[in-house]
Amino acid sequence: MTGSKSVRNLTQGKIFSQILFFAIPVIIGNLLQELYNVVDTLIVGQTLGEIKLAAVGSTSSLNFFALGFFIGLSAGCSVITSQHFGAGNIKQIKKSVAAHILIGVISSAVLTVAFVFLVNPFLTMLGTTKETFDYASRYLTIIYLGIPATMLYNLTASLLRSVGDSKTPLYLLLFSSVLNVGLDLLFIVVFKWDVAGAAIATVVSQLISAVLCCIYICFKVKLLLPTKESFTSIGRMVADELKVGCPMGLQNSVISIGMMVLQYFVNQFGSYAVAGYTIGNRVQMLVQNPMNSISMVIATFAGQNEGAGKYDRIRKGVNYCLILCITYAIAVGALTMLFATPITGIFTSNSSQQTIDYSVQFIFWNCPFEFTLGMLFIYRGTIQGLKNGIIPMIGSLIEVLMRICAPVILSSIIGYISICVAGPAAWTASMLLMLAVYYIKMKGFKNKKALA
């Protein structure tokens, strides 16, 4: 049925080994994707200075507001593909791909135009400092113009993962990441394109990765190639994909709203705080990326196994993923805290002690709570894999509320620390909701099995 050795059926075989071997390429691939942003931060910080580093960093929440939507939308739409793959229905697999393409093309075209025109109003709304505004505007405009490239990569990569192929996106992303480093150095250091060079390098690298993914699917995974017939009478399929994909996409965008509010409060502490927060946030995102990757794995795993009616296998898979995430969070969190100061120093040359202090403080308040975030990722990913996008979106609204409340209530009392504790508070509140919903769903499956 698959047409490719790289395709993996997650409804059969030993659960732990299936999850582990599927997860490793996803983890490495997502780390490489995160390195796009980290490399920009490193090179901008080392070559252009702290002001331009703060400019690039101040756009991160706005960047994720748009790009996070497509990441969630693609992952959600691919849940439907994974369920049809688990059920072995080739015709429906192709229809789901056709619907995914239609949704991706229309949404990326509309949002690219809208967001490019909203760059400056967005930055003004966030209270971006005068010395960083022009640089931030230039960088973000180019990133938004690259939305179609981001959409195309996430569409193709998520489709490959939906049929159990996590290696191919990794190989292509590895090539693209190396290219990104080279283009960063070429555009910033040689061509002197300033922060615009960093943005162009990121967009070009992701576009190349997306094109290579498309070529691979055309020649190696023809199961994912829709026919002309696949595009007919797909209204129901589009609706099914939007039912899962939109809440997942909006979930990311809603979370980014909380990040924007947080960025507004960070901006009030000045450019050194913005630079320190940027570095600390980049470090934390690298730490969190493997756990987020396992969340993507469990979503695919749950989707395929629900399609096959193997509910007990879902429960066991979740337990294995929880063990992986919690163990990782404790170990890596401790190491990150231990080496927080030297890690911070890597990002800028001649960085001020103020910037280092802000960054280290952020890391020290976040790392002890990473295990909570890991649990949130696993429970949320499972619920999304079971075609429920509404509950995770409600969880995202809770996260936003907590991210807003922390600085609003505490900034006048504990200052910058209110920024640091906003994330852990948001993770904990949302995780408790996901935990409750997960166990309710598992109980429902148990009753369903008993009745059968």
Q: For the regions a protein language model found, what residue spans apply to each?
A:
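Short alpha-helical transmembrane segments in multi-pass integral membrane proteins
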Residues: 1-23, 81-146, 190-246, 302-369, ...
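Hydrophobic transmembrane alpha-helices of multi-pass small-molecule transporters
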Residues: 65, 180-185, 210-214, 286-289, ...
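Transmembrane helical elements of multi-pass membrane transporters/channels
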Residues: 21-40, 142, 153, 176, ...
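Residue-level signal for short hydrophobic patches within transmembrane helices
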Residues: 12, 16-35, 39, 62, ...
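Short runs within selected transmembrane alpha-helices of multi-pass transporters and secretion channels
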Residues: 74, 143-161, 169-177, 198-213, ...
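Small-residue-rich hydrophobic transmembrane alpha-helices
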Residues: 53-113, 150-169, 276-340, 373-395
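Transmembrane alpha-helix boundary and packing residues in multipass membrane permease domains
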Residues: 26, 30, 42, 79, ...
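Helix-terminus/linker motif at the lipid-water interface of multi-pass membrane proteins
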Residues: 35-54, 123-130, 186-193, 253-286, ...
